[in-house]
A protein has these predicted regions:
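Helix-start (N-cap) detector for alpha-helical repeat units in TPR-like alpha-solenoids
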Residues: 37, 71-72, 105-106, 138-139
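Structural marker of alpha-solenoid helical repeat scaffolds
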Residues: 66, 100, 133-134
């Protein structure tokens, strides 16, 4: 009887571990450790800090070419395209980031800002609703909520 219970306990423990791993992975919003090791990713971040959007686009294109599943790089590629006013390219990059990680807070926020810049408030509100479910008290949620609340069609939005 004890042998049966011990076997059952071990089996349940292994099953719990197997099921827990995907949940942890789905809850991981970024690839920070991996990105630190990518020179072009760092170059892209420096280009964004310097507002050199063309260089940022070039850098992040290289990152996603080498690592197409890097949601962070797709997100920052979208951000850089958006800063250049290339909204179709920006939305395509955000869509890729969100296909990889549907809970990517940065991509949800930045795409929402892009929708506001292109006078698509309903789409921005949809991104905001997703953010509220993921993390109601996060800075990304607060930032997009403020922008949506202050939105006036045709107004210039100061954030990139």
């Amino acid at each position: 009887m004890q042998k049966f219970n011990l076997s059952r306990l071990i089996a349940l423990s292994l099953l719990s571990l197997a099921l827990a791993n995907p949940v942890l992975a789905a809850d991981t919003p970024t690839m920070t450790e991996e990105n630190v090791k990518i020179d072009e990713y760092a170059a892209g971040q420096k280009a964004i800090a310097a507002k050199n959007w063309t260089l940022a686009v070039s850098s992040f294109k290289k990152v996603v070419a080498d690592n197409p599943k890097n949601a962070d790089a797709h997100n920052l590629l979208g951000y850089s395209h958006r800063a250049l006013g290339k909204f179709d390219d920006a939305f395509a990059a955000y869509d890729k980031a969100l296909a990889i990680d549907p809970k990517h807070k940065g991509a949800l926020e930045y795409s929402g800002m892009g929708y506001l810049k292109t006078n698509q408030k309903a789409k921005a509100e949809a991104q905001l609703a997703k953010l509220k479910v993921i993390c109601a008290s996060c800075s990304e949620t607060a930032s997009l909520a403020k922008a949506v609340a202050e939105f006036k069609p045709g107004a210039v939005i100061s954030t990139y």
